[in-house]
Amino acid sequence: MSLPGKFITLEGVDGAGKSTHVGFVAEWLRGQGREVIVTREPGGTALGETLRELLLHREMAADTELLLMFAARQQHLAELILPALARGAWVVSDRFTDASYAYQCGGRRIAAERIAALEDWVQRGFAPDLTLLFDVPPAVAEERRSSVRAADRFEQEAGSFFARVRDAYLVRARAEPHRIHVLDARQTIDAVQAEIARLLQDLT
């Protein structure tokens, strides 16, 4: 699927610090004269934000969680992402489908084949142009999580859950090195953002 705009996603375990860099990516691109839409998953649309509240704060079966994630993603694509890209805007999303492989496959241990089937149905070959994966060891991420706001349903998971999530992310990165770039998020913010700027320059 060829569209005039570009789609950039930011990924990482809770506590990796990716949300810190969403604004930097958007402002850097705006500085290049791009129209930029910043969004997130789950969420990004009115329906998606309603589903986000359910996903973050209500107990549910793992398969239910996965299906709701992709329901929100379908609406996100149809209502926001694809129309924006079609008019030439650049879309920057805090999480996308790699998070489903990390959290629902790695963390929840749902078979990757189930996620791939949903991905194929919902996305029909569509994928980000660039994914920035912010990586930190589980202990560092846990320390960062404990120092912020009240934890949501995912953030309350055990360290072993996040270790599986991280491993699943790194498996994805090794499988798609042309798209997914792993950033050592233990570095200073300035060092990480210098690396981000280099990757954005290559894309533009």
From Swiss-Prot:
It catalyses: dTMP + ATP = dTDP + ADP. ATP binds at residues 12-19. The keyword ATP-binding applies. Keywords: ATP-binding, Kinase, Nucleotide biosynthesis, Nucleotide-binding, Transferase. One of its GO terms (cellular component) is cytosol. It comes from the Bacteria. GO terms for biological process: dTDP biosynthetic process; dTTP biosynthetic process; dUDP biosynthetic process. Belongs to the thymidylate kinase family. This is Thymidylate kinase. It comes from Thiobacillus denitrificans (strain ATCC 25259 / T1).
